[in-house]
């Protein structure tokens, strides 16, 4: 992260750090906010976060930005207020404060549950791979955060959209082919 911060600083690129999944680390792993890496990262970043993913309250439309740099903070403040997206309702504010301040036991249970889901997925992939020819094996990309899984299916097909449709139709499993993140989806 420090190297990314240095490169962005040197090339006058502001880092917008989407840390919406920050609370969803696997048990035993910690989250490192980008702005906490060093002063350079803090002064050249906008950290976006919300309780919406972790606490399943997206309908409340609540989020926050943390911007240590006062000049950058003012620019973002102007943009948010010009577009009138900076006025949360009272219920959203109360729910957000409760989520962040009063939910640690529940959050620890959630993190353990999600880690169990990942272990189950890993076991299923290992079982599949044990029976599959080497050229047909898939790989679970190791991750220690979020409830999302990245599965490399490039040995199965180059038509990831077709694979996703097959999995949805025949196995009731929803996949995103990943093309929206750039590249060819595998």
Locations of regions flagged by a protein language model:
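The start of beta-strands in P-loop NTPase/AAA+ ATPase cores
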Residues: 12-14, 173
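Conserved core segment of the aminotransferase class I/II
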Residues: 39-115, 165
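Conserved C-terminal alpha-helix-loop-beta "cap" of PLP-dependent enzymes
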Residues: 136-139, 148-186
């Amino acid at each position: 992260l420090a190297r990314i911060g240095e490169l962005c600083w040197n090339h006058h690129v502001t880092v917008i750090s989407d840390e919406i999944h920050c609370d969803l680390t696997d048990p035993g792993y910690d989250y490192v906010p980008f702005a906490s890496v060093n002063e350079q990262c803090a002064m050249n970043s906008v950290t976006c976060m919300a309780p919406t993913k972790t606490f399943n309250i997206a309908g409340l439309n609540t989020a926050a930005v943390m911007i240590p740099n006062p000049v950058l903070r003012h620019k973002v403040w102007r943009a948010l207020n010009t577009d009138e997206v900076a006025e949360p309702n009272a219920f959203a504010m109360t729910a957000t404060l409760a989520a962040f301040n009063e939910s640690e036991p529940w959050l620890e249970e959630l993190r353990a549950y999600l880690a169990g889901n990942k272990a189950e997925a890993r076991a299923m992939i290992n079982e599949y791979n044990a029976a599959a020819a080497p050229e047909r094996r898939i790989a679970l990309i190791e991750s220690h955060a979020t409830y999302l899984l990245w599965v490399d299916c490039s040995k199965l097909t180059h038509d990831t959209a077709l694979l996703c449709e097959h999995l949805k139709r025949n196995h009731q499993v929803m996949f995103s082919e990943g093309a929206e993140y750039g590249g060819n989806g595998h």
